[in-house]
A protein has these predicted regions:
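Short beta-strand element of Class I
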Residues: 144-148
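Hydrophobic/small residue at the entry helix of a nucleotide-binding pocket
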Residues: 127-132
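Rossmann-like dinucleotide-binding core of oxidoreductases
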Residues: 243-319
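N-terminal ligand-binding/catalytic initiation module
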Residues: 1-116, 362, 366-369, 408-418
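Conserved N-terminal Rossmann-fold NAD(P) cofactor-binding segment
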Residues: 152-190
């Protein structure tokens, strides 16, 4: 049974009766421009998301079914009480799901997103951070108003402020976003915070097979501190993780922000969906690079997908509709080892990740377009194709072949260890 309620300008749908709000008829609810579906799994996942399939009304725990339309169809058949008009509203993208109680839901709905160009702040002006800055400055004029930068090295910040602000189109001097040097207490006065800090990157020639995981312990401590600062600032924007290992650091910052001063979990920090990891975009681009060079992989360019972390657990599918396990594993290996080829040439492989994974993917996020990033999924952060909508995060769901699904299950099991 469904209950319908009017709360200010929003219409809520719930399977449980709610006290203290005005109940309305189903006919009245059906006329609403959008609906807010209140899940009974309070605090068990993302606070808000797009209900993109009837399966979400089954209120199952988040999991890989969110990426698999086969499993979604099975779950949807368990939901018997959904009126036709509500199914049509879901198909049109007009239903937001919330995993919160009534008070938290009202607080979420009261937040008004900045509809104008965004303010983006970047932490750390090393190789990666400075490249992200350049790419955002040159490519983001349509959706970024200002770029704030912070680094412990003040001279480094001054250098980049001078350099980037002296790049301009003649007679269109405000076409590109301005760059401003920040103090640490200003870091979270923004719409998007981009974490590019890193304790250390293994030197060229170092005998390290998985460079990204070698950075985990040190970078986890750093990002946890900024999770606490985000909590203290009451930050409501997007916390974008660029440093390696991306997916594991997403978990680190989310957890750190939700513990009190005594280390006890209280859930008062960043919401799961506020944290996104930006590492998968370059792996998709690297797979496309090899697909262009070898006709055996050509199907990837139109039918392929990338999933998971951008490290040893990466999952590349040559095609979802015509999945070939052997080809997919070979293309995955080539993609994972692409950074080692750059290191063998004597260079650190940071330019393509900074632009493909971070800058381009961040801009696609702000524009509400499909891109690759890592998002919260039942306690882990899993990379997949997704987009941000007015009604929450939408994860792409495809009919995943059994062998591909098995690979994703193995990856999820590994990520659960962190």
């Amino acid at each position: 049974m469904m209950f319908y309620y009017q709360v200010q300008d929003e219409v809520l749908v719930s399977r449980e009766a709610l006290a203290g709000v005005r109940e309305i008829t189903e006919e009245e609810a059906s006329k609403a421009q959008r609906l807010i579906f209140m899940s009974r799994r309070v605090g068990a996942g993302k606070a808000a998301w797009l209900v993109s399939h009837k399966a979400y009304l089954a209120e199952a725990e988040e999991g890989l079914w969110c990426l698999d339309s086969n499993q979604q169809d099975v779950l949807a058949r368990q939901v018997q009480d959904v009126p036709q008009w509500l199914e049509e509203k879901i198909a049109a993208g007009g239903v937001m799901g919330v995993c919160a109680d009534l008070a938290q839901t009202q607080e979420l709905l009261a937040r008004k997103e900045n509809a104008d160009k965004k303010v983006v702040h970047i932490l750390a002006m090393g190789d990666v951070g400075s490249t992200v800055l350049m790419a955002l400055a040159l490519l983001g004029g349509d959706c970024v108003r200002e770029l704030g930068i912070y680094d412990f090295n003040e001279r480094l910040c001054q250098r980049w402020e001078h350099e980037i602000n002296q790049i301009a189109y003649p007679w269109a001097y405000d076409r590109l976003p301005a760059v401003r040097v920040l103090t640490e207490d200003q870091l979270f006065q923004c719409d998007v915070f981009v974490f590019c800090a890193s304790k250390s990157i293994p030197a060229i020639g170092a005998d390290v097979q998985d460079v990204r995981m070698a950075q985990y312990e040190a970078n986890s401590a750093i990002i946890s501190r900024y999770g606490v600062l985000a909590r203290e600032a009451g930050f409501q924007g997007l916390f974008a993780v660029v440093s390696d290992p991306v997916d594991q650091l997403c978990c680190s910052v989310w957890r750190a922000s939700n513990r009190d001063a005594m280390g006890n979990w209280d859930g008062e920090g960043l919401r799961p969906e506020q944290v996104q990891g930006y590492g998968l975009g370059v792996m998709n681009s690297r797979a496309a690079y090899y697909a262009k060079q070898d006709a055996r992989f050509q199907s990837f360019l139109t039918e392929g997908r990338a999933y998971g972390p951008h490290g040893q657990q990466l999952v590349i599918a040559n095609s979802v509709t015509h999945y070939d396990h052997a080809l997919s594993m070979e293309l995955t290996r080539l993609t994972v080892e692409a950074n080692l080829e750059i290191r063998a040439l004597g260079y650190k492989p940071y330019i393509a990740p900074a632009v493909s994974s971070a800058a381009i993917s961040l801009l696609l996020t702000l524009r509400g377009e499909w891109h690759y990033s890592s998002n919260f999924l039942h306690g882990i952060y899993m990379g997949a194709k997704n987009r941000s909508t007015r009604n929450g995060l939408e994860l792409e769901a495809l009919p995943l072949p059994p062998q591909l699904l098995a690979r994703l299950e193995a990856v999820a099991a590994e990520l659960e260890k962190y």
